């Protein structure tokens, strides 16, 4: 990393420190124990913990986490393919035989095209023969899973945003701005210290309990939108990530809206 980038990171981090300290009085509470900052191992994200840094004090059994992003606010990048089981990965319910029966002919066709060295630009009507039927199979499977397990909406959001509470800190270099987003689903953030209550209240975020609607985005053949209760809305856009055909497609998952309780705090750079 060059010196200029290091300097940018320092300015970005410094702009957010005072706000994090204000929201977390226990970080600066007078105590004889050590305040420990620990970098998470890469494998933690696979297990549902998206925090990059964990800050803790052992003697009071307290910890908070930070997720650090640079110039992007991406949700998990997923795929649909002939072997990836999104149901098992997202909400711990393996995809049904009906799903695999629906998608197998599409992926078999794509595998043949790959073996022939075809390019995506050479696939006629790829929206109608690939994107639309795959998304229909995806929606049918999500609806099927929801009928079987009413906790599916909560499990899916936890897969996307993580199972632990944390602050997401996003550096926006071009805007000279650092954003802090609060994810306080389990009411572990923003606790008072022995002698201070934060001037900033970090609300508890309610996870979804109901799948309200799942349908194609109006005017689109490659994007579906999911509406959940408690203020959660997502979009799922399917697209090919390479020039040549593969039996695998990228699934771009984005939040269209989040609950009001997720605070979005702007920290301007000096």
Identify the residue ranges that each predicted region occupies.
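Short, positively charged
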Residues: 1-51, 56-270
């Amino acid at each position: 990393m060059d010196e200029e980038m290091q300097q940018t990171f320092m300015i970005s981090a410094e702009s957010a420190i005072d706000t994090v300290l204000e929201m977390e009085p226990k970080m600066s509470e007078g105590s004889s124990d050590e305040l420990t900052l620990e970098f998470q191992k890469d494998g933690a994200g696979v297990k549902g913990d998206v925090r990059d840094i964990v800050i803790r004090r052992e003697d009071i059994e307290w910890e908070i986490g930070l997720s650090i992003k640079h110039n992007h606010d991406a949700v998990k990048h997923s795929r649909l393919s002939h072997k990836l089981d999104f149901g098992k990965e997202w909400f711990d319910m393996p995809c049904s035989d009906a799903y695999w029966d629906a998608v197998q002919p599409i992926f078999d066709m794509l595998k043949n095209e790959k073996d022939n060295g075809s390019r995506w630009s050479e696939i006629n009507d790829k929206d109608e023969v690939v994107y639309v039927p795959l998304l229909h199979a995806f929606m049918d499977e999500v609806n099927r899973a929801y009928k079987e397990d009413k906790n599916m909406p909560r499990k899916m959001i936890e897969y996307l945003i993580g199972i632990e509470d944390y602050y997401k800190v996003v550096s926006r270099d071009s805007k000279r701005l650092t954003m802090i987003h609060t994810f306080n689903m389990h009411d572990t953030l923003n606790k008072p210290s022995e002698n201070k209550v934060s001037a900033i209240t970090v609300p508890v975020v309610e996870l979804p309990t109901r799948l309200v609607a799942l349908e194609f985005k109006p005017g689109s053949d490659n994007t579906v939108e999911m509406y959940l209760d408690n203020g959660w809305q997502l979009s799922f856009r399917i697209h090919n990530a390479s020039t040549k055909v593969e039996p695998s497609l990228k699934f771009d998952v984005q939040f269209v809206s989040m609950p009001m309780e997720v605070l979005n705090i702007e920290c301007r750079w000096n």
